[in-house]
């Protein structure tokens, strides 16, 4: 990695933390300069504007989360175990989420809707990608004869992704992981009802 790349990566990683903990609108270029200890010129040589930094930081958050999801699924044998492993990535959503500040998808969706179309589009794609991951695992479960064949795959996948985001939000806003625990408990019952 070149020196320029390292500086750009530092800007992205630092900005991701700031945006996800303080919010996009509450984070200024000056905040990024202070946190990175870089002058304005170093930032603007790499990014046209704050919006470009936001989009790069959001992309980075996706890479980080997908890495967590794949690592969680590594030694799981069944589709249900893989799905539950993904959900357990956020088991301490209130105090110790995988990325400080909570779920970048949820935070970005809330901050972007109606005001930042490019980020809203990226967040919508992030949600769709999560639904498709769930759908691929459900399909895998059907193909391996772990799950019943009459499942509406996309409907269940969307329900699972939406429920996960809701559980993360409830745990974060209440500062209590009990909501994520309830989610896991209920989702287990729901998923096992589809077992063969």
Swiss-Prot record:
The keyword Transcription applies. This is Uncharacterized HTH-type transcriptional regulator pXO2-48/BXB0055/GBAA_pXO2_0055. InterPro entries: Homeodomain-like_sf, HTH_TetR, Tet_transcr_reg_TetR-rel_C_sf, TetR_C. Residues 28-47 bind DNA. Signal peptide: none annotated. Pfam families: TetR_C_13, TetR_N. Keywords: DNA-binding, Plasmid, Transcription, Transcription regulation. GO terms for molecular function: DNA binding. Residues 5-65 form the HTH tetR-type domain. PROSITE patterns: HTH_TETR_2 (PS50977). The keyword DNA-binding applies. PANTHER family: HTH-TYPE TRANSCRIPTIONAL REGULATOR LMRA, TRANSCRIPTIONAL REGULATORY PROTEIN. It comes from Bacillus anthracis.
């Amino acid at each position: 990695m070149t020196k320029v790349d390292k500086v750009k990566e530092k800007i992205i990683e630092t900005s991701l933390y700031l945006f996800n903990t303080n919010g996009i609108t509450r984070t200024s270029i000056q905040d990024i300069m202070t946190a990175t200890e870089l002058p304005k010129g170093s930032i603007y040589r790499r990014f046209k504007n704050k919006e470009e930094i936001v989009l790069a930081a959001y992309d980075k958050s996706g890479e980080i989360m997908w890495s967590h999801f794949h690592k969680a699924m590594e030694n799981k044998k069944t589709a249900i175990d893989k799905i539950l492993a993904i959900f357990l990535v956020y088991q301490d959503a209130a105090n110790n989420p995988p990325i400080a500040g909570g779920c970048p998808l949820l935070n970005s969706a809330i901050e972007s809707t109606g005001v930042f179309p490019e980020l809203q589009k990226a967040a919508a794609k992030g949600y769709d990608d999560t639904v498709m991951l769930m759908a691929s695992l459900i399909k895998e479960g059907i193909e391996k004869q772990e799950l019943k064949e009459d499942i509406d795959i996309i409907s269940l996948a969307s329900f699972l992704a939406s429920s996960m985001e809701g559980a993360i939000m409830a745990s974060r806003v209440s500062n209590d992981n009990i909501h994520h625990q309830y989610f896991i408990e209920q989702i287990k019952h729901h998923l096992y009802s589809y077992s063969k």
